[in-house]
Amino acid sequence: ASVLTPFARRMARLVPGGLQRARRWYDARQPASEHNDLRGSKSNISRHYDLSNELFALFLDRTMTYSSAIWDDATPAETDDSPRDDDTLAAAQIRKIDRLLDLAAVKDGTRLLEIGTGWGELAVRAASRGANVTTVTLSREQQAWAIRRAELAGVGDLVDVQLHDYREVTGSYDAVVSVEMIEAVGLEYWPDYFATIDRVLAPGGRVALQSITIEHQRLLATKGTYTWIHKYVFPGGIIPSLHAVRDIVAHNTRLRVSSATAYGHDYARTLHSWLERFHANTAAVQALGFDERFTRMWKFYLAYCEAGFASGYLDVHQLVLER
C-alpha cells in the first residue's frame, strides 16, 4: 500500500480529467451476466461472499465484520509484530456497529430491517438491545453463519436471517440499517434500492447507511468501465458519490439525507489490519485450496484499497436518512 498510495494521491494529475472521461470509450464493458437484476445480483454476491467462510475468518476479526471500523484515537495501532491480535480491531468494529444502531435509534422493541447481513454481528448486537431483526442476504454461506451466531448469542428468536434480494422485502420497519451494501447494487438500481427503503420504512422511522464513496466527477468518468477488480473481486460493483446519493434520494423517495459523516482514514487503517492478517495467514489460506495466484491477487486487492483510502481517492460515509 505504501507504494500505491502516492500514485492514488496524484491520480488526477497522472490521468487528466479528459482522459479519465474517455475511459468509457476504450475500457471493457460490464458483461450482461453481471448486471444486478435479481439473477445477476445473486450470482455476483455468491462469487465473492461464498468463497469460504473460513477464508474470511483468517483475516477478519472475531466479529467477522467486513466493512470499515471506526477507530478511537486512544486505541493503539496494530503493529506488524502482532497481526493476530484482534482485540483492537474487534473493538473498533463494535464501535462502528453501535454508532450505526444509535443513528437509527435502535432500542428495545424496534422493528429493524438490515439490508446485507454480512456474518451477523450487527443483527446480534441489535437483538441484544431487544430489537426484532429481519436481515436479508444473497449469500448462503453468510446466512448459515449468521443464524448460528444468533443462536449462540441467545438471540435466535429475535433474528430472522432471510435469503432474499432487498427488492423482495415486505413489511414495515421502524429502522433500516445497511452497511456497505449499496456498492453491490449497481448504478442503474440505486433508485430501486432507496425506493425499497422508503417503501418499508414506517412513519417516524430512521435509516442509517454506511457507504464507500468517490468524488462525483470520478464517478461520472468511470461509470460503465470494467476493471480488474470487477472481473476478479467484486463483479457488478460500483461506488457512489455523496452527490449521487443525495440526488437519487431526493428524486426517488420521500426521504432526505439529514447527516453525513466521513472517516476514510479509518478505512485505510482497517484495510491495513486485514492485509497484515492475510499476510500472516497465507499458508492457512492456501491450505483451504486457494492457490498462489489467488493469494497474490487478494493481497494486491487489499493494498490497492488501502491506498485508495489513505490517499483520499476513496472515502467512506455514515448517513442518516429521514422523512
What are the residue ranges of the model-derived segments?
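Conserved class I S-adenosyl-L-methionine
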Residues: D108-G116
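A short glycine-rich, Lys/Arg-flanked "PGG" loop and its adjoining helix->strand segment in the class I
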Residues: P191-P203
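A short acidic, Gly/Pro-enriched loop at the edge of an enzyme's catalytic core
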Residues: R167-V177
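N-terminal auxiliary segments of SAM/dcSAM-dependent transferases
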Residues: A1-R62
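Substrate-binding/catalytic lobe of Class I Rossmann-like enzymes that use SAM or dcSAM, i.e.
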Residues: T213-R323
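Conserved SAM-binding strand-loop segment of SAM-dependent methyltransferases
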Residues: A153-Y166
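Conserved SAM-binding loop of SAM-dependent methyltransferases across substrates and taxa
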Residues: W119-G130
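Conserved beta-strand signature within the Rossmann-like core of class I S-adenosyl-L-methionine
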Residues: G204-I212
